[in-house]
Amino acid sequence: MLFRSEVKPATREDASWDEMKHKAADIGKANTQSNKYDIRDPYWKLIKQNKRKIKRDYEFNINSPEFQDLKLLVQTLHAAGADVQYVSIPSNGRWYDHIGIKKDRREAVYKKIHSTVVDNGGKIYDLTNKDYEKYVISDAVHIGWKGWVYVDQQIARHMDGHAPKNHEVDYSKNKPPHKHHNDRQDDQHQGNK
């Protein structure tokens, strides 16, 4: 059995990927009732209590020294002949738009991650065009319910020998959702007037 006895699977063992994505969306919706950013409720509570940083200007730095670390990792594993598939996950686009880290800044970093992997011999599964898709991310940057289904599906493909296509993500198709109401109430609570 693949599951620990106390863990009950959310779907049947033979569920299709579409069924799993639908179930993941249901679970995500049930766990993000307290806010419009699809951030899991316990994390949102910490944000509201000012126990998590809202100002995150240090993130999405195109000149981060971590890019050299990534390059070295990809080159080393490629030279060793390792069968590695890197996964580039998005951030929560609606949340980052709200706190002032705009889409173009995030996309520049996503593109640099993608090119660093590909240009150094790596294969990448790029999910960064899903930063506005509900429940792919569970807070600001951590993979969420639906995101895990995408990753699991790609792992299964990879294990079956189906390599990802190292294509460039078309960010023009990844548009922020239309705002249906004013962010004023959230802004006032967080002191971002």
What are these regions (language model features)?
Residues 74-101:
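Active-site segments of SGNH/GDSL-like serine hydrolases
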Residues 57, 65-66, 85, 94, ...:
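Long, well-ordered mid-to-C-terminal structural blocks that present hydrophobic/aromatic surfaces
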Residues 96-193:
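Long, positively charged, glycine-interspersed low-complexity recognition regions
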Residues 1-80, 174-193:
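Secreted/periplasmic serine-hydrolase-like ester/acetyl group-modifying domain
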Residues 14, 41, 92, 142-145:
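Intrinsically disordered regions, especially transient/low-confidence alpha-helical propensity segments
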Residues 48-53, 88-91, 114:
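Generic detector of short, locally flexible boundary/turn motifs and exposed helical patches
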Residues 71-84, 113-124:
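A structural motif corresponding to the C-terminal end of an alpha-helix
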